[in-house]
Each structure stands twice: as structure tokens, then as C-alpha cells.
Amino acid sequence: MLVSSRTNARVKQLRAAFQGHARLSGGLVAIEGDHLLEEALRSGLVLKTVFVSEGRIVPSRVPTSVEIVRVTEDVFQSAVETQSPQGIAALLVPPVPLLEDVMRRTPLILIAAGLQDPGNLGTLVRSAEAFGATGVLTTPGTVSAWNQKALRASAGSVFRVPVVAVGFDEVAALKTRGVR
């Protein structure tokens, strides 16, 4: 079946996720494009729904348990935020790492304090992965790592490097434990 209505419930959920409305999207995160989809699959994330525009083929790596929604080009473009969409998007369950996940073994952590440019955060997460960091901590006022621009700039690293939002009190507690 080909969805041709912009008001279809699944399309509205995808649009809400792209706009960062977690409550309206059921807490799911939207990704767009072949590369991010491949990185999400490679990282073992749980895909809930894959959206493909007409004429696109669903990648064979997508598990058969994942719901596939085929949409017209017009509907696809109305739901995603990129100017030149690739015709494939997905809703996924974002990982929810804990501070303990980042602190396991000898930690190498990056703290992003008050970083507001999503592209910069994504680049830092990608660099953190390249340097073998156990995680990235973000303080209040820092943009979400699940922001669309941050996701693209991370090139999928945000799927593998735990990014944990912490308060300033937790950062201070880490300093008293000798973490620098």
C-alpha cells in the first residue's frame, strides 16, 4: 500500500519525531538517509518503522519485523527536514545510557558544557569515538545529541558512544573523584 496523505498517522509521527516532539512521536527518534540507517542497523539499534518513498527499495539488512511504510515523494518530502531527501527514513528507539555506562573501566570522557550548535556536538561525538572515549556527558543548556543536525554530523557515532545528560552537580562529583 502506498500512503499518499500527509495526515496519515504514521507520517504525522515521523514528522513529529523530526521536529523533536518526543511526546508526539512516542519517544522515538527519526533518522533520514542511507548512511544513518546503515549505521543504526550496524549499531544494533531497534528500528520501529522504515519509511521509503516510491521507487526506493528497502535495504535487505532491515529486519522483517520492522514495519515498512511506503509513501509518495510528496508525502516523504513533507515529513523530513532535509532539502534533498534520499527517500528513506526510520523511527528508532534511542538508547538511554546511564552515567555508570560511561564510567565503566577506566573512563575517557568528553564533557560538552553549554554547547548549542548541534553540528559541533555531532562532530565532538564523532571525535570522541575516534579517540576511544567511553562516553560524552552533556550539561544543561547543551543541545540534544538526537537533534537532526547533530545526528548527521556524528555520522552515526551517537549510536555507539553513550551520550548522557548530567547536571553540574554530577560533574562536580566526578571532579572530587579525581576525574579530569
Enumerate the language-model features and the residues they cover.
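Short Pro/Gly-enriched coil loops immediately N-terminal to beta-strands
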Residues: 83-85, 156
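Conserved N-terminal subdomain of the carbohydrate kinase-like
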Residues: 85-91
